[in-house]
Amino acid sequence: MDLFGGSLYISGQIRDGGRTNRAGLDPRRQYFAGMDDKEYAFNRENHRIGAGEFEQVSLMFNGSFPMETGGTFYAFGGMNSRDGESGCYYRRAQDNRTLRAWYPDGFLPLISPTLTDTSLALGMKGIMDGAVFNGYAYDFSVTTGSNEFAWGMQNSHNATAGTGPNQQAEFDLGTLGYSQTTVNFDLATQIEVEGFAGPVDLAMGAEMRMENYTIEAGEEAGYADFGYDVLDGPNAGASAAVGCQCLPGLAPANEQDRDRDAFSLYAEMGGNVTEDLLLDVALRTENYSDFGSTTNGKVAMRYQIDEGVAARGSFSTGFRAPALQEAYFSSIATNFIDGVPLEVGTFPVDTEAARALGAQDLEPETSENLSLGMTYKDDKFSLSVDAYMITVEDRISMSETFRGSGTSSNMVDFFAERGVPAAAGRYF
């Protein structure tokens, strides 16, 4: 629509998606020995493996408007909300994790998360008019966005609550949140540089980036140990699994509220040194509130060998600070390892559990990238051939899952001593 001499576009979307299931039939024995009638009658389509069902609502806008002082004001953004449901691994009737008083035939816990995304960008751009940077194209913007992932669980229970008053089937397991705000100011122009065959493109700018990562605990019933043991069956009296089945809730010990600020300056210059040789040079320096400063650059060249034939090459360095999520994410979930269901914890590197497994402070990734190539083009045919080599140091990735020999003869006790209800663990 036309508005204030500019334009505004608004779009929305509603989606309702069903689930898929490629799990097939469960061949395992479900009940204790002597319950063959129930075993034969059991519905073995008890898993859900595939895309989960969801309901989603999205709304986006994009607008630009002329300013009285010259230039253009622009804005864009939107929101997205999505409710989903997907299955965990089925808990059999004979499983120690099953409260048979509630689920005599076993049960399938259902993860029911709610995801909320929001974003908004405001900016203005135009040509500067003044004593400083006269004639430069400018672009000033502020962009903010956030993501919230609220964990929910249905059709589950906490085995340590037994049949007591704290038992329930639906849980609020906690919330993961991330937000980022960036402030950018960019300038661009063409200048004359001695030694170049023509005008040189020049761009420069500054950026301020502010990040926040949070983990909020869920309700107590999702993570607490209420003291009940296995109530019946051949293993009656054994320790019961702690927390909501499939995904124990985030506890106060998991809570995080971490911030990072980064400020950067950058510049890029490119143009024809000769009629056949193009040179491009870029430099960026950045300071992180938690990882110090870094400076990285790029040099790229393209040489026109003959009509339709050119050679090109570039060299650049890179830097990536560990994401806040890599440094501080914490959770416990059921994973199948060699066919055995285990409660696997993912621990921040600064926790006692991660340190005991061998975790060290994360270091920023650094990289070097070298590429060389040739291009050919005529009226009927084009060809590009490139070779590249990328070297990455201090690469950040998930560790192996530690669950036995070399760590402890009893992993449950190993983690319990550190206040973690897990049987295996890993870290970034």
List the predicted regions and their residue ranges.
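Transmembrane beta-strands of outer-membrane beta-barrel pores
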Residues: 14-18, 79-85, 128, 144-148, ...
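Hydrophobic, lipid-facing positions within transmembrane beta-strands of outer-membrane proteins
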Residues: 6, 55-61, 116-122, 179-185, ...
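Outer membrane beta-barrel strand-and-loop segments of large Gram-negative receptors
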Residues: 182-184, 363, 387-428
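Extracellular loop and loop/strand-boundary signature of outer-membrane beta-barrel proteins
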Residues: 44-49, 106-110, 166-175, 250-255, ...
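Outer-membrane beta-barrel transmembrane domain signature of Gram-negative proteins
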Residues: 107-121, 127-132, 144, 154-278
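Short loop/turn motifs that connect adjacent beta-strands in outer-membrane beta-barrel proteins
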Residues: 2-6, 66-72, 127-138, 190-201, ...
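Transmembrane beta-barrel wall of Gram-negative outer-membrane proteins
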Residues: 1-105, 109-127
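Outer-membrane beta-barrel signature, preferentially recognizing the C-terminal barrel domain
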Residues: 56, 115-117, 246, 250-262, ...
